[in-house]
């Protein structure tokens, strides 16, 4: 997190050139770390640049473990669209314009990209902006886009509230022929957006291009943190990933070297034969060796085989990677043989704890974005929305065991101890139905005389199908 004192902002609430150079310098110092994390995610780990002596096998095997960790953690957190709900008709009327704007800018894709970036880099950044409505240039709506963390950051006040002061996004500018031409910067404050040009990120001179107003009521750049340390999900196991890559690469190198064993001759020598062939040519072409007497011996020099030890170490490393990252190995044979709902939850317990922390920080960003959209909607004349009363729900992307839910509902129905609402919830537990969806289904069942009783519905549905 980059922090500065609010009192050093200018009268417009924007950073001075000196402050801007200072925060850019602090951001640039963190770029090697971000680049390293990106390389691991893309599979470009250090093993790919390993150099060995000439003539030795140099297999370089990089495993996409970082991508696996990010994919599982991101899918579990943001695999399902985020839901927004509020009580009251008037409140819902204030929320509807915002959810409509969310739909137009594919908010679920933005959320997924933010979750992925936070999982890789420890933080994600998005930019809320105004977009012209297609087909009507006189109408605008708010939209949002995810920015690369290597090129964007938010600066916070140095008080205990961590209030955003301004955000910075930059790109490398180019000339007409594509050659580099410095950088363009957009500095977003609470009221203004300032566009600048700078020769390089450490240059002393900053040239202002334009200053425009925005209508979001606060800094229109939102950061999503992965945790309080802004660390990526695989950052703590990088040394284990390196060890795993090295072990597997060396195993392949050893196998390759076995083909080039040294031949040990005892009690005899090999010389050029009558055809002028060197000893190595004789062995390669004839595939045979004639020894002069029974005292002579020939054997290959074998290195000590450590395949069993290597396999034990390999298993220990991969187990430690999953344990320390808290992302389970879903291909574990012990787990694959037991896929009941209870077993699944035990297997995912560590991931659930990790995701709970990730979700708390992600929610902060979602609510900050919602406040920006709510302010913009109010400026456009829509009803005022109390953002604090909006219920934001993130649903886990769990594999569903519909058979268990159906069996549970059948048991409850046979005992006569559960209401229609309870049994509907049981049938659709795997579908993550909301309260409104459950209530609508109950009313449909109870209000339709042609509907069969619950027991008939359960039997007709079959294991794991539920009510359509």
Protein language model annotation of sequence segments:
Residues 127, 146, 169, 265, ...:
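Residues in well-ordered beta-strands of folded domains
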């Amino acid at each position: 997190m980059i922090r500065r004192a609010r009192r050093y902002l200018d009268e417009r609430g924007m950073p001075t050139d000196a402050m801007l150079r200072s925060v850019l310098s602090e951001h640039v110092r963190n770029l090697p770390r971000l680049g390293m994390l990106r390389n691991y995610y893309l599979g470009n780990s250090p093993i790919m640049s390993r150099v060995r002596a000439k003539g030795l096998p140099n297999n370089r095997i990089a495993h996409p473990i970082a991508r696996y960790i990010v994919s599982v953690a991101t899918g579990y957190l943001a695999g399902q669209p985020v839901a927004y709900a509020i009580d009251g008709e008037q409140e819902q009327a204030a929320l509807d314009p915002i959810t409509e704007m969310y739909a137009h800018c594919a908010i679920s894709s933005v959320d997924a990209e933010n979750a992925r970036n936070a999982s890789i880099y420890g933080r994600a950044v998005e930019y809320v902006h105004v977009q012209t409505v297609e087909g009507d240039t006189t109408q605008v709506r708010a939209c949002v886009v995810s920015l690369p963390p290597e090129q964007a950051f938010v600066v916070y006040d140095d008080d205990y509230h961590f209030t955003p002061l301004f955000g910075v996004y930059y790109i490398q500018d180019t000339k007409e022929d594509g050659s580099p031409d410095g950088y363009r910067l957009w500095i977003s404050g609470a009221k203004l957006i300032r566009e600048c040009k700078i020769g390089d990120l450490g240059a002393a001179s900053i040239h202002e291009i334009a200053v425009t107003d925005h209508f979001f009521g606060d800094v229109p750049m939102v950061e999503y943190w992965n945790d309080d340390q802004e660390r990526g999900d695989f950052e703590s196991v990088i040394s284990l990933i390196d060890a795993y890559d090295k072990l597997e690469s060396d195993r392949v190198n050893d196998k390759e070297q076995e083909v080039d064993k040294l031949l040990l001759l005892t009690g005899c020598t090999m010389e050029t034969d009558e055809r002028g062939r060197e000893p190595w040519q004789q062995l390669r072409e004839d595939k045979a060796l004639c020894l002069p007497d029974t005292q002579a011996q020939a054997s290959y020099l074998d290195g000590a085989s450590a395949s069993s030890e290597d396999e034990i170490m390999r298993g220990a490393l991969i187990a430690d990677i999953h344990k320390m990252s808290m992302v389970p190995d879903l291909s574990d044979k012990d787990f694959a043989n037991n896929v009941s709902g209870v077993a699944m939850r035990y297997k995912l317990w560590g991931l659930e704890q990790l995701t709970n922390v990730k979700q708390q920080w992600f929610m902060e960003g979602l609510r900050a974005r919602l406040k920006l959209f709510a302010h913009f909607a109010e400026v456009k004349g829509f009803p005022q929305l109390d953002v604090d009363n909006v219920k934001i729900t993130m649903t886990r992307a769990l594999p569903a065991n519909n058979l268990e839910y159906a069996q549970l509902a059948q048991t409850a129905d046979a005992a006569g101890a559960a209401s229609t609402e309870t049994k509907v919830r049981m049938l659709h537990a795997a579908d993550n139905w909301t309260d409104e969806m459950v209530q609508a289904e109950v009313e449909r069942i109870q209000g339709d005389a042609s509907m069969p009783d619950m027991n008939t519905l359960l039997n007709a549905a079959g294991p794991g199908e539920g009510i359509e």
